[in-house]
Amino acid sequence: LYLAFEILDYALLSAPGAPLKKALIDAGIGKDVSGSFDSGIYQPVFSIVAKNANVEQKEAFISTIEDTLRKIAEEGIDKKALRAGINYHEFRFREADFGSYPRGLMYGLQLFDSWLYDEEKPFIHMKAIPTFEFLKEQVETGYFEELIREYILDNPHGSIVIIRPEQGMT
């Protein structure tokens, strides 16, 4: 799931023409829409963020996300976007370019993503090539659509967080 949700985040919210981002912006919800997947914790979190949205749009935000994801789960996600997401993340993995951060430090932090919660598999994220191959094989099978259904649409655990700025408190 670690990489699969990174791919879903890319295809749904980051890629050019990403359908979930487009649906929220077309509905006038927020000026900037983004997503993230935090997998370095025991219970991973998939977030959808609409910046500069009105509090009154909360229900529209929820229904737009649910309706769009149901449609995508039923009709299928754009296969080109999935392949692009896989290629993007595989390229980043193979290049191992961490900018100004020391490579060893970044590898150590990657190890913690699994090692903290499964002492038997500290290197699982370092050996990702088979996972990329698996994900490529799953593009045409409905695997990603099932992830949307199981882990987002049919998941009873979720939250809506509204952060309101207070004028003059910058």
Residue ranges and their predicted role:
Residues 21-136, 156-169:
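M16 family metallopeptidases and their MPP-like homologs
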Residues 2, 20-21:
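Glycine-rich active-site loop/lid that clamps phosphate-bearing ligands
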Residues 138, 143-150:
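Extended alpha-helical coiled-coil "stalk/arm" regions that scaffold and mediate dimerization/assembly
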Residues 2-12:
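Active/ligand-binding-proximal structured segments within catalytic/core domains
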Residues 141-142, 168-170:
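Extended non-catalytic domains of envelope/secretory-pathway proteins
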Residues 151-155:
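Amphipathic heptad-repeat coiled-coil/leucine-zipper-like oligomerization helices
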